[in-house]
Amino acid sequence: MNLQLTLISLLFFTSAIAETFKNLDSHPQFPCKPPHFSSYPFCNVSLSIKQRAISLVSLLMLPEKIGQLSNTAASVPRLGIPPYEWWSESLHGLADNGPGVSFNGSISAATSFPQVIVSAASFNRTLWYEIGSAVAVEGRAMYNGGQAGLTFWAPNINVFRDPRWGRGQETPGEDPKVVSEYGVEFVRGFQEKKKRKVLKRRFSDDVDDDRHDDDADGKLMLSACCKHFTAYDLEKWGNFTRYDFNAVVTEQDMEDTYQPPFETCIRDGKASCLMCSYNAVNGVPACAQGDLLQKARVEWGFEGYITSDCDAVATIFAYQGYTKSPEEAVADAIKAGVDINCGTYMLRHTQSAIEQGKVSEELVDRALLNLFAVQLRLGLFDGDPRRGQYGKLGSNDICSSDHRKLALEATRQGIVLLKNDHKLLPLNKNHVSSLAIVGPMANNISNMGGTYTGKPCQRKTLFTELLEYVKKTSYASGCSDVSCDSDTGFGEAVAIAKGADFVIVVAGLDLSQETEDKDRVSLSLPGKQKDLVSHVAAVSKKPVILVLTGGGPVDVTFAKNDPRIGSIIWIGYPGETGGQALAEIIFGDFNPGGRLPTTWYPESFTDVAMSDMHMRANSSRGYPGRTYRFYTGPQVYSFGTGLSYTKFEYKILSAPIRLSLSELLPQQSSHKKQLQHGEELRYLQLDDVIVNSCESLRFNVRVHVSNTGEIDGSHVVMLFSKMPPVLSGVPEKQLIGYDRVHVRSNEMMETVFVIDPCKQLSVANDVGKRVIPLGSHVLFLGDLQHSLSVEF
């Protein structure tokens, strides 16, 4: 019997691989084709998702079930079910990193939005939603062309904990609130069937969008996946790799740094996929940690499927030695709640794990129910997708003018002006007769998008776009590549700099310095780039404009302090519209308003062990802490830094000076008993709060924002709080609200921050419980301060 099962399994797996790697069809394969297969109950759209999933699982034999446990799911020919590829990528546009997306068909490109770290610098929630929506439209269009799946493994919502991390560029930065809200907006935009205006014009005229109800029925346009769960932010550093690293995380840091983005992605974003990470967390591999994965389902209400990162189930045994055999690794993952393995490990070892009694077939069924439920919510079993709600989306909806305009706007809003001495910028294009552009990234298109970039709609370099403004523009790379190991090209760079009215030096990072599976060892500019900048600055007629590429922070203290370098602009990985956005900002057609979503540390920070996951500073061991919330050391640029060509001023119109928390607690609470016995109460523990009572204590902070300069501009208003130090580990400060507003010259506008004290004024204590410190909370708005007394 065992041998027979093994032979059947091999036949199914071989069939799946053969079908999956056929030439791509111009239309997607789909199940429930009439007349032979549409009569199955799982094809009956009048039944519930759960009923249909249960019906489908009940019809499968064990080898067929096992064939579904890989990202490349096997076909089930006798039921009319074709193979399905779960792994498609859409971090900031459709990408062909995985097998799900291909640009080898009739659709050969897709809109390349700026890398996530750049979009995050806009601090614009609406923009994040719009990007998610646009990528979803292109994803559905690609699916209709047979060139993509319906399940995409984005966004990356790990907190950018260490500036050396090679994948920090993929994240929305270092602040848990910003990361959380980016994740929610992107996922909503990506998954929601009913878009906020974005898709109305794209649905076919004969489809009544309203008849599909809203998203309360659980149906999805596409499936988004929040990754990497959890405490994953190291690729290769020292003797550690992401495959064997054990992230030792305190309960306090887990609660208020590492977990919030995932909790909100599930609770508020309703993500339909969660990806567990390679690393172990406190000694247990993330993909084998049942309490971690089940918390997402039981406490946070996760309804979707859980995938491992690619080969992360294999690492449980092969790299981490957590189990004694592959079968135990597979069993531990399935029991913990992993539904699908990116890779073939479960295909190869699940059957023997069942035969050895290490995992039951019932748990495999549980995994399949989760997988099929998501496919059913996507309409995969509802018949020919060409006749569905999105059936008319096609090549005209990819690289559309609307999407390219959106990509340009995202890049404009995300670019950050870090220095602008004596108002060097903007340049007057009518008064600039010649430009010199220096630097290996200035005329290189290959790394404009950063990691997880597909085939962009347009391929123009920074140099090409600047040439549109000043026809007499010369270029010299200075270095042969970003590593800049030699100064042999300096002479040409110096020569063109001497003869130009203005000089722009493009320096920084590319994917040779920071990427997946590669962390940085230094925070300085690579190789001899610093020397190149200084040599050019020494001969230029006017102070140099320094443009910085890359996702991670760079120590440019030398440039910050050098008067020969008049302006510094960070563009990150700006995507396909990066050159145009940069040129518009340099020449004043767009007023910059981005702010850094990360702290920029000095080179000395590399003395801190990247493997140390502690967020809080510890002076007794010389540990400076991490991110603006806890870091106590020197900074090159602080979180939220960002200049404009105009000046903004604030005025707090109204905010409470006192907040009583007494109504949050039941009469018999331990806190009230403490007070009755004359004990001092230093904080309120949220576990003791009456359910849903926090909403009654929300308050508004009304702010006037005035543009006192001569140029219209958009501006990110940031509201921080500093809580009383009544318990250990309170942040230095934390962001509790932000809003991007556009204010015309010499005008003002009002913005309102709605503050939920249970969320924005709370912190985790040393056992990971949320508490609100009592005492004076100081609210910061630029140079303004406002004291709020939180009492009981």
UniProtKB/Swiss-Prot annotation:
UniProt lineage: Eukaryota, Viridiplantae, Streptophyta, Embryophyta, Tracheophyta
Listed SUPFAM superfamilies: (Trans)glycosidases, Beta-D-glucan exohydrolase, C-terminal domain
Keyword Metal-binding: no
Gene3D superfamilies associated with the record: Glycoside hydrolase family 3 C-terminal domain, Glycoside hydrolase, family 3, N-terminal domain, Immunoglobulins
EC number(s) reported in the record: 3.2.1.-
Principal location class: secreted
Protein family according to the UniProt entry: Belongs to the glycosyl hydrolase 3 family.
GO biological process terms on file: xylan catabolic process
Xref: Pfam families: Fn3-like (PF14310), Glyco_hydro_3 (PF00933), Glyco_hydro_3_C (PF01915)
Domain of life: Eukaryota
Residue numbers annotated as active site: 309
Stored InterPro entries: BXL, Fn3-like, Glyco_hydro_3_C, Glyco_hydro_3_C_sf, Glyco_hydro_3_N, Glyco_hydro_3_N_sf, Glycoside_hydrolase_SF, Ig-like_fold
Enzyme class: hydrolase
Protein name: Probable beta-D-xylosidase 6
Underlying gene: BXL6
Record-level GO cellular component terms: cytosol; extracellular region; plant-type vacuole; vacuole
Keywords from the named record: Extracellular matrix, Glycoprotein, Glycosidase, Hydrolase, Secreted, Signal
Subcellular location: Secreted, Extracellular space, Extracellular matrix
Signal peptide start and end residues: 1-18
Single GO molecular function: xylan 1,4-beta-xylosidase activity
Residues carrying a glycan: 44, 104, 124, 239, 444, 618
